[in-house]
Amino acid sequence: MALAKFVNHLSGRRATPLGMKPWAFSPQELTGMMESPHLHYRPFSLPKKSGGVRQIHAPEPALKMVQWALAPFFRTMFTPAACSFGFERGRGIVENAEVHLGQDWLLNADIQNFFPSISARRLKGLFLSEWGPELSPYMADCLVQLVTHQGRLPQGAPSSPVLTNLVAADLDIRLEGLARHFGCRYSRYVD
């Protein structure tokens, strides 16, 4: 994938998510976002239901628009597994729970700090393996810089949910196979 094609994809996005102003991105603007990503996030904390706090790194409007534009681009890389109920249209917490109706036992596990546990290195490897020779290592680095904060996937970025599902796809396949082997059901819900 050439840099020009990537920039054209972002430059042509003029939809307005969540009432934001239409935005087109020049190569200079994208470069600025990649070279100084720390300037484009606003950190804050939210209380967790279970106690403690969840650290959010919300992208500033321009970077948020870039990430919002990239999300469908990343979505083309995979088809979510049937067992994945996080951040998929029409597949929420209720549909996730329905998978387990009638079961005698239920095991609920939480992956602590799931978003920031996904590193920039992991994402780069994933991009290179999924796109193969279409994506140069340089372009993979560019994508990673646009969607990570301090080398990690941030909570609060519009591209993070689809990327967590992409990273977890192999895990889903393995855990679903293991569950099936033992006569159990597996699903993954992310909120």
For each of these PLM feature ranges, what is it?
Residues 24-28, 63, 67, 80, ...:
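Alpha-helix initiation and N-capping motif
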Residues 99-190:
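Conserved polymerase palm-domain catalytic core
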Residues 11, 74, 78, 131-132, ...:
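A broad structural signal for alpha-helix termini and local helix breaks/kinks
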Residues 1-43:
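Non-catalytic, polymerase-adjacent accessory regions of viral genome-replication enzymes
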Residues 63-108, 112-116:
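Active-site-proximal segment of RNA-dependent polymerases
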Residues 44-67, 85-89, 108, 145-165:
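Short, conserved non-catalytic motifs in the polymerase core
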Residues 30-49, 136-146:
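Reverse-transcriptase-like RNA-dependent polymerase core
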Residues 39-42, 91-93, 178-182:
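Short amphipathic beta-strand starts and helix->beta connectors
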